[in-house]
Each structure stands twice: as structure tokens, then as C-alpha cells.
Design a protein with these regions (language model features):
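Bacterial Sec-dependent N-terminal signal peptides
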Residues: 1-25
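Edge beta-strands of jelly-roll/beta-sandwich modules across compartments, strongly enriched
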Residues: 130-143
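Non-catalytic extracellular/lumenal accessory regions of secreted precursors
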Residues: 21-59
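Short, surface-exposed beta-strand/strand-loop-strand elements in extracellular ectodomains
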Residues: 80-96
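Noncatalytic modules at the cell exterior or secretory-pathway interfaces
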Residues: 114-132
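Extended, low-complexity, turn-rich repeat/linker tracts enriched in Gly/Pro/Ser/Thr and Asp/Glu
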Residues: 77-85, 130-133
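Hydrophobic beta-strand segments within beta-rich accessory/binding domains
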Residues: 60-78, 123-127
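Extracellular and analogous surface-interaction loops
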Residues: 59-69, 113-119, 144
Length: 144
């Protein structure tokens, strides 16, 4: 009897584990685009309605980054997004350290590499170009 109960418990646990690992296709695509020499750390799903263009990016989150570590930030858009996902990284003094949007050329990069020179909490600010509506994901990876 114990054997049957253990088998049922094991099967139920296995089913829960398999269902929990169902990945978002957009996240999977973005992780694969980060490159073979990277290790996935975290993803941020961003979904925003159309806003008014301003200097401030609308989706803000924080992440702890470590000194002497190279990070890759990859941005991917869903097919129905009207704008392209943009990322700006700020340090603890609110100074912009790096951005995927080059204001001079107007170019938006699909990924940016960042070598952290100081451990600490960094603010990650996301938005879509021209404050358009969109859905996307930002993936943080460590470059080996």
C-alpha cells in the first residue's frame, strides 16, 4: 500500500514540476538571443500602454550587480508592440551609467554589455520608444 501511495505522490509532484517549468516563448527567445557564452540571471516582463513622451522611463525596478562582472542586458519585443523596448541603467546617485538608446543617432540596441565597476543596487528603467504601447521582456545575463 505504501508503494502505491508513494508512486501517486511522486507522479503528482513530477506533474507540478513539469507545469512550473513552462516558459514564456518571448523570454525563451530573448535568453537564446543573449548568446552561448552567457548565463541567464533574471528577466523583467514589461507591458505598458501608450504614454506621453518624456525624459523619464515608466517601468522601474532594481537589481544588485557585482563589481568586476560583465552583464548582458537583452531586450525583446512582442510582435504586437508598437515601440521598441529601451533600457537605461542608473547607479545609486541616479546617474545614467548605460542606455540601449543612443540619443545622438536615435539608434536602439537590442542588447548592451555592462562591466560593473562598483557593487551595488542599480536602477533598471524600461520603456518603449516614443512612449508607445508595447509588451516585451528584458533579460539579464552574466557573460562568462
Amino acid at each position: 500500500m505504501k508503494k502505491y501511495i508513494l508512486t501517486i505522490v511522486f507522479l503528482l509532484a513530477a506533474e507540478l514540476i513539469i507545469k512550473a517549468q513552462t516558459a514564456d516563448p518571448l523570454v525563451s527567445k530573448c535568453v537564446m538571443n543573449a548568446g552561448e557564452n552567457t548565463r541567464y540571471l533574471k528577466d523583467f516582463r514589461v507591458q505598458l500602454a501608450k504614454g506621453s513622451p518624456s525624459e523619464e522611463l515608466r517601468y522601474k525596478t532594481q537589481m544588485s550587480l557585482w563589481k568586476n562582472t560583465k552583464y548582458r542586458f537583452s531586450m525583446c519585443n512582442s510582435e504586437d508592440s508598437k515601440g521598441e523596448l529601451i533600457l537605461t541603467i542608473k547607479d545609486n546617485t541616479n546617474k545614467v551609467v548605460l542606455s540601449s538608446y543612443d540619443q545622438k543617432s536615435g539608434k536602439i540596441y537590442p542588447f548592451i554589455d555592462f562591466i560593473c565597476n562598483k557593487s551595488g543596487i542599480y536602477q533598471l528603467n524600461f520603456d518603449f520608444s516614443e512612449a508607445e504601447q508595447g509588451s516585451g521582456v528584458g533579460v539579464v545575463s552574466m557573460v562568462r
